[in-house]
Curated annotation (Swiss-Prot):
Coiled coil: 166-216, 248-316
Keyword Cell division listed: yes
Assembly with partners or alone: Part of an astrin (SPAG5)-kinastrin (SKAP) complex containing KNSTRN, SPAG5, PLK1, DYNLL1 and SGO2. Interacts with SPAG5. Directly binds to microtubules, although at relatively low affinity. Interacts with CENPE; this interaction greatly favors microtubule-binding. Interacts with DSN1/MIS13; leading to localization to kinetochores. Interacts with MAPRE1/EB1; leading to localization to the microtubule plus ends. Interacts with PRPF19. Interacts with DYNLL1. Interacts with MAP4.
Protein name, as recorded: Small kinetochore-associated protein
Tissue specificity field: Widely expressed, including in skin.
Domain statement: The coiled coil regions mediate binding to kinetochores.
Phosphoserine sites (modified residues): 128
GO biological process, one term: cell migration
Protein localization: Nucleus; Chromosome, Centromere, Kinetochore; Cytoplasm, Cytoskeleton, Spindle pole; Cytoplasm, Cytoskeleton, Microtubule organizing center
Species the sequence originates in: Homo sapiens (Human)
Amino acid sequence: MAAPEAPPLDRVFRTTWLSTECDSHPLPPSYRKFLFETQAADLAGGTTVAAGNLLNESEKDCGQDRRAPGVQPCRLVTMTSVVKTVYSLQPPSALSGGQPADTQTRATSKSLLPVRSKEVDVSKQLHSGGPENDVTKITKLRRENGQMKATDTATRRNVRKGYKPLSKQKSEEELKDKNQLLEAVNKQLHQKLTETQGELKDLTQKVELLEKFRDNCLAILESKGLDPALGSETLASRQESTTDHMDSMLLLETLQEELKLFNETAKKQMEELQALKVKLEMKEERVRFLEQQTLCNNQVNDLTTALKEMEQLLEM
């Protein structure tokens, strides 16, 4: 097998990009760009500038390669690397939620560095005299790897997006349940507070009544000469109680003697009353007898007068 001949130096691979210019359509005067449109336009401008710089660098490298004899051009490899850089510089907001501009610029600056190293490796392989089929295989593998990575990242982000609403719904449901539980607990606490307040009012009233009763009891004990703290009588109260007891005993003795005398006098008076009663009865009997006697005498006189009158009538 003979080694493949190198192509002539004047042959150059050129790729034509699709025209990005679009027909200008007139916009209404009230048209206003949204914030995400302005961010996308800025990112697209940044990617085109980066791609242009890479193309210029690749053209310079290819110019130096053309000057060296027996070296193939590297236009195709640089174009594939530019495509990769443009794909890597696309805004991640197109695949998932938009990120801030600082992170996007950092991603673009980081993605530019390894691309140049890849270009150098591929150019080394080309300078070493490898066949063109190897170059196409490498470019295809890189494209497939980039597409697979992009699809993996897109699917992961889509899965994350799909799971977010479920987690939000769960969190909202949990929050609602917690709020309902808290409301029920608050109601129970309010009820307990009202009940305890009512019990406190009742207890305060009972305490006030007990304090009044205690004050009355203390006043009574002090009036009787009792010590409420010790629960015993004091010396002065004891002396007073002894004197009072002696006085009461003397009074009792005198009362007993007086009662005895009263009983004796009462007995005598009863006897006298009975004698008076007998005398009164005798007097009453005498009065009755005298009255009857007078009545009898009057009747006798009447009868004698009547007899005299009858005798006179008979004599006539």
